[in-house]
Swiss-Prot record:
This is Extracellular protease inhibitor 10. Residues 23-72, 90-127, 156-208 form the Kazal-like domain. The gene is EPI10. It comes from Phytophthora infestans (strain T30-4). Keywords: Disulfide bond, Glycoprotein, Protease inhibitor, Repeat, Secreted, Serine protease inhibitor, Signal, Virulence. The lineage of its organism: Eukaryota, Sar, Stramenopiles, Oomycota, Peronosporales. GO terms for cellular component: extracellular region.
Length: 228
């Protein structure tokens, strides 16, 4: 009886460990860009990043079955619970998209009203406003993308293409195993994602010490400045 109880505790501990590891590996957020995709589980996700997040958290291997909303989406939303970014904002809000990329690719609705891109049109329809922030600003650039800088993926993520990964602008330098200093841990993670063959990991906080020739150069420069 005692052995059975001990075995049960061990199984619970293993399950908890696996669950905690899964949560750590899935600690990334996604941009609130509304570009719906249909999952292999028959549920609709706000975009492919949210599908990957759901797949990661559920460990069910959910894949994209197609672009756009599924023919019939279950009553319960497929979008994961909101993920808090480093800036304190949340993403994954069920329903209307909260932001769109400032990419100028004009489209018109059935009434002939023009929008900066498909996402802004979908947002306006969803919220029932007919309002296009990007179009009113007259800026077809990527200022919103630069301004938001929402955390998109955790460091070391080596999943699908890294093109939709963004990091906050905070300066908290870290040292990489490749001998480079990165502005913050998230930036190191993006490089690791883009170059999985290098298996770049964080080896410490702060900037890398200046050594060798670099030290000599820095010293010589300091001496010149002092003499000047």
């Amino acid at each position: 009886m005692k052995s059975a109880f001990t075995l049960s505790l061990a199984l619970v501990a293993v399950t908890a460990t696996i669950s905690a590891a899964a949560d750590d590996n899935c600690s990334f957020g996604c941009l609130d860009v509304y570009k719906p995709v249909c999952g292999s589980n028959g549920e609709t996700y706000s975009n492919s990043c949210y599908l990957r997040l759901a797949s990661c958290k559920s460990n069910n291997g959910i894949t994209e079955a197609g672009d756009g909303e599924c023919a019939s989406t279950p009553a319960s939303s497929a979008t994961p619970s909101p993920v808090t970014s480093s800036t304190g904002s949340t993403s994954g809000t069920v329903g209307c998209p909260d932001m769109c990329l400032d990419v100028y690719d004009p489209v018109s609705d059935e009434n002939g009203k023009e929008y900066s891109n498909q996402c802004y049109m979908e947002m306006a329809k969803c919220k029932g406003t007919g309002y296009d922030d990007n179009k009113r600003s007259g800026n077809p650039g990527i200022s919103t993308l630069d301004a938001e800088r929402k955390l998109a993926f955790a460091p070391g993520y080596q999943g699908p293409p890294c093109g939709d990964m963004l990091c906050p602008d905070n300066y908290a330098p870290v040292c990489g195993s490749d001998g480079e200093t990165y502005p913050n841990e998230c930036d190191l993670g993006i490089t690791s994602c883009n170059h999985p063959e290098q298996n770049i990991t964080m080896v410490g906080e702060g900037t890398l010490p200046v050594t060798g020739a670099a030290t000599a150069t820095a010293t010589a420069t300091a001496e010149v400045v002092t003499r000047w």
